[in-house]
Amino acid sequence: MRYIDYGDGGPPGVLKLAEGPRPVPKAGEVLIEVAYAGVNRPDVLQRSGSYPPPPGASPVLGLEVAGRIVETAPDVTEWKAGDVVCALTPGGGYAEYCAAPAAHCLPIPRGLSVKEAASLPENWFTVYDNVMTRGRLKAGETILIHGGSGGIGYSAIQLAKVLGGATVYTTAGSAEKAEFCRRMGADVALNYREQDWAAEVAKLTGRRGVDVVLDMVAGDYVMKNVRSLALEGRLVQIAFLKENRIPDFDALPIMIKRLTFTGSTLRRRTVEQKAAIARPLRVHVWPLFESGQLRTFVYRTFPLAEARAAHELMESSQHIGKIVLEVKPG
């Protein structure tokens, strides 16, 4: 089969089309003939050497796919060959065939294309768990979402608004991106290049602060987030686009305001832990796609052989929404 190899890692130019053996599904897994694969920031980090795959995972890039099941392990009963699914994968998505846990597969929501479905798993597993479970967002609360125009960001905006019933503030890096966030449901979108977002959040909330912050930036954003939270607020850290260290960290406001500072990664969780996220997604979120209350947005699609260009676009941060690789669209 064809797949994308990144050799010893490095800049996007290391990504090359290669030939390799087709994976064999292990117990509890299915083999998917990949039609489309989503491109995500962790793929870029893995390629550059700063996010190695966990033990036992495929070394091939790609954490989400959509396509047709062609084989199942003997113990798999919930899916069969011929079923068309989207799936969260532990790796291996940038390939013509990818093995994935059966419990991490979801049907294509009615009304969405296979290409659109490939853009769902990584974002929605991440967002549902971190906003609803770890962030404990409740109806009537306020949430600040950083990076609202990216895949995680616009998914979180919609989830918080439609399922969470919250007031949503978000940050974005341009007027165009801010407008996109508003179209996705954000009540207020702040251009962080032109506005002091922390000062604006203070004004918008009457200096009360927000109940939840979902952050992918870290670095000097952390203490700004802490100061932007209300009493009993929750800061959920899911990435660090700046740095993982916190300059000028001060624990006192966390203690005074009784804040919860939590964080998570998705890829290193067990199969069972990820399956526990898939179940409520199918019950509570997938019907909202089918009713048109939730949307996905694929900004650009590249052929598998042009994975380099897809990564260059991801690293430029010029995109809005999702980037997808076309593998074997059928």
Language model: regions and residue ranges:
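NAD(P)H dinucleotide-binding glycine-rich loop of Rossmann-like/cofactor-binding domains
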Residues: V14, L45, E78, V84-S149
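Mid-domain Rossmann-like dinucleotide-binding core that forms the NAD(H)/NADP(H) cofactor-binding site
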Residues: A118-Q195
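N-terminal Rossmann-like NAD(P) cofactor-binding module of classical short-chain dehydrogenase/reductase
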Residues: C86, L144, L190, V213-L214, ...
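Glycine-rich beta-strand-centered segment in the early N-terminal region that forms part
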Residues: P21-V39, S50-G92, M216
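Short, glycine/polar-rich helix-capping loops at beta-to-alpha or helix-loop-helix junctions
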Residues: G93-A95, A172-F180, I246-A251
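Glycine-rich phosphate-binding loop and adjacent beta-alpha segment
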Residues: G164, D220-Q293, E326-G330
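Short amphipathic alpha-helix with an adjacent loop that forms part of the alpha/beta core around
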Residues: W197-R207
